[in-house]
């Protein structure tokens, strides 16, 4: 069953009098429980497509349906509520707040919910345990390695039990060993916890961990050869 259904999506920006076509008729289906790698050169539109899937932007044309909801027809307020419930984001640069402990960083998405403090703490502790950092809950980002910081970032992304996990170059700022550990974790989230994952990467080594790979180049999408 498809969780993500993207049909004939176009996206363009304007710079002065110039029109820049970033996505040109992209269509893509992602199955429930799939781990998809999205590859392509710099400037190919990978992050733009990921942002559209996460409801951070809207297409110029075409349709985007995720978990039965049409994102392209939603207003800004609707999108924000939908995004908070259904999407977990993992970024290349972690984006942790340095003045908060690992646990408090993981709790941040839950501040937008009606959950009380004790329940937020409990869910953050569970997420940190899943990523193997239960013993680092009280540590600040400066006390963690880069790989550990990214694990906290992943815990923050899964703390609200999202429908879809979107990862933008999650190993791009890590050395090979730490990057492999993050890829191991993403595979485990997909395999053991049933998380549907779309991962943007330029690294073929990282893409090998996914169950399927697609390539985006000059705004058009092609399936990788089996």
PLM region spans:
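Conserved switch/coupling elements of ABC/ABC-like ATPase nucleotide-binding domains
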Residues: 218-226
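ABC family nucleotide-binding domain
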Residues: 2-217
